[in-house]
């Protein structure tokens, strides 16, 4: 019987294939501390990583045969340290695609139609003063241009969904891909053309603070920013200034640089819709994520090559 360490209290649906093994997992909705992980990881043959897993923790996992990242983005795992230890790290990009794309579209609608702002005003103001034709005008998605930065699985799915709303779609990606639903362009063109910009690139040294004050200055006045990728891609101070000045009409944010903290200055703005990193938070998606991680672990235990190894082993 192998021991599998699960760093966070994830839903157990989808883990049935691992029930013959010893599962170490914290209480639901909680997570092991770094010290607890250091104490437990020497006992583990595999890890399902739902958050940060630094090199000093990985290196004491002498029995580890695989680290299965519970998500598409794996910037929280020190993949170089794992590679140096001969431990493959996997991710599960396919299972989160549709749910995250749906959330991006939902945030576009919420910001464009001022749904979040109107919900807040109805709860704290005189409702009668909020009704009336011509008040609090929003904007439709139809006919507007969506700029997608990062056209991997999720970016492509967002492009397909946006087309169904009648949007024109342009895309900028590290490796341009041929898309029936989007036209490739460079980043300056995208920033200056798009009415809505949606981020779907990974957080790397190259993309950290990709959208800074200079980038916001290139955007169309009244543009909207959607971020369901990683908070570190955006310079939050520059974003806040662009929102307050009116350079941006609004933003829909699911991710933040220092989660679980959300900058108070963003929460204070009515034209910002914030969600707490819920891109994959559907029952169906979470079960699919657990099932995919379980299969990767079983493949590693059986001497097979798991799918989606991200650290070159």
Where are these regions (language model features)?
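An N-terminal-biased, well-structured beta-alpha scaffold segment characteristic
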Residues: 1-90, 192, 212-214
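Glycine-rich Rossmann-fold phosphate-binding loop(s) that bind the pyrophosphate
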Residues: 151-152
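Phosphate-binding beta-alpha-beta segment of Rossmann-like dinucleotide-binding domains, i.e.
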Residues: 85-87, 93-145, 160, 172, ...
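Short beta->alpha connector loops at strand-helix junctions that form conserved
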Residues: 26-29, 70-71, 87-98, 173, ...
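Rossmann-like adenosine-cofactor binding region
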Residues: 55-58, 168, 174-265
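N-terminal Rossmann-fold NAD(P) dinucleotide-binding loop
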Residues: 155-156
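Short, Asp-centered acidic motifs that coordinate Mg2+ and/or phosphate
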Residues: 45-46, 66, 196, 224, ...
């Amino acid at each position: 019987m192998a021991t599998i360490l699960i760093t966070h209290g994830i839903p157990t649906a989808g883990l049935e294939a691992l029930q013959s093994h010893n599962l170490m997992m914290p209480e639901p909705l909680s997570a092991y501390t770094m010290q607890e992980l250091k104490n437990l990881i020497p006992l583990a043959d595999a890890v399902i990583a739902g958050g940060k897993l630094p090199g000093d923790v990985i290196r004491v996992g002498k029995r580890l045969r695989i680290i299965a990242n519970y998500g598409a983005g794996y910037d929280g795992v020190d993949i170089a340290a794992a590679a140096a230890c001969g431990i493959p790290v996997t991710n599960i990009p396919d299972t989160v695609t549709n749910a995250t794309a749906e959330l991006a579209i939902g945030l576009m609608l919420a910001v464009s139609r001022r749904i979040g702002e109107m919900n807040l005003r109805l709860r704290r103001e005189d409702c009668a003063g909020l009704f009336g034709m011509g008040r609090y005008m929003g904007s439709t998605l139809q006919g507007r241009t969506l700029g997608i930065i990062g056209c991997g699985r999720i970016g492509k799915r967002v492009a397909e969904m946006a087309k169904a709303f009648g949007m024109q779609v342009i895309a900028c990606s590290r490796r341009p891909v041929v898309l029936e639903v989007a036209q490739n362009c460079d980043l300056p063109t995208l920033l200056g053309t798009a009415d809505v910009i949606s981020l779907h690139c990974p957080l790397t040294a190259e993309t950290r603070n990709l959208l800074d004050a200079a980038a916001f200055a290139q955007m169309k006045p009244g543009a909207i920013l959607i971020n369901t990728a990683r908070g570190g891609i955006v310079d939050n101070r520059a974003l806040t200034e662009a929102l307050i000045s009116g350079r941006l009409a609004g933003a829909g944010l699911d991710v933040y640089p220092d989660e679980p903290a959300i900058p108070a200055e963003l929460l204070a703005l009515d034209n910002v819709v914030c969600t707490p990193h819920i891109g994959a938070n559907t029952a169906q998606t979470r079960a699919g994520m657990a099932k995919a991680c379980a299969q990767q672990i079983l493949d590693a235990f059986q001497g097979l090559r798991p799918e989606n190894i991200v650290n070159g082993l």
